[in-house]
């Protein structure tokens, strides 16, 4: 697999969970002998939802809720078959979305 690259994108609402998952992936890759670039923090996506507090009137009274989506990018340079096997076996929290390219 010389000259190849694996790109892993992580997405989560909790920044502590995504950082712990990225740390676990980097440790696994380094232990199996491949080189790694990252984790690179990508821009945090912020969605704000405005909701009227009252069910009937008083439209001026509103409440704002926000959801932040944290993202990280990890590149694995020249992965070995042992690296790919270790990545398939790694156990990550369900709250972290992993996209491998």
UniProtKB/Swiss-Prot annotation:
PROSITE patterns registered for this protein in UniProt: RIBOSOMAL_S10
Gene (UniProt): rpsJ
Keyword Ribosomal protein attributed: yes
InterPro entries in alphabetical order: Ribosomal_uS10, Ribosomal_uS10_CS, Ribosomal_uS10_dom, Ribosomal_uS10_dom_sf
Stored Gene3D superfamilies: Ribosomal protein S10 domain
One GO cellular component term: ribosome
GO molecular function: structural constituent of ribosome; tRNA binding
NCBIfam families, sorted: PRK00596.1, rpsJ_bact
Full protein name: Small ribosomal subunit protein uS10
Assembly and binders: Part of the 30S ribosomal subunit.
S-S bonds: none
One biological process term in Gene Ontology: translation
Similarity section: Belongs to the universal ribosomal protein uS10 family.
Function recorded in the entry: Involved in the binding of tRNA to the ribosomes.
């Amino acid at each position: 697999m010389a000259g190849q690259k694996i790109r892993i994108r992580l997405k989560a609402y909790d920044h502590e969970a995504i950082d712990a998952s990225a740390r676990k992936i980097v440790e696994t890759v380094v232990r199996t002998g491949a080189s790694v670039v990252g984790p690179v923090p990508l821009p945090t996506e912020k969605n704000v939802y405005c909701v009227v507090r009252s069910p009937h009137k008083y439209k001026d009274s509103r409440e704002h809720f926000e959801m932040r989506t944290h993202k990280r990018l990890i590149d694995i340079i020249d992965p070995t078959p042992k690296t790919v096997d270790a990545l398939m076996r790694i156990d990550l929290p369900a709250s972290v979305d992993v996209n491998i390219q």
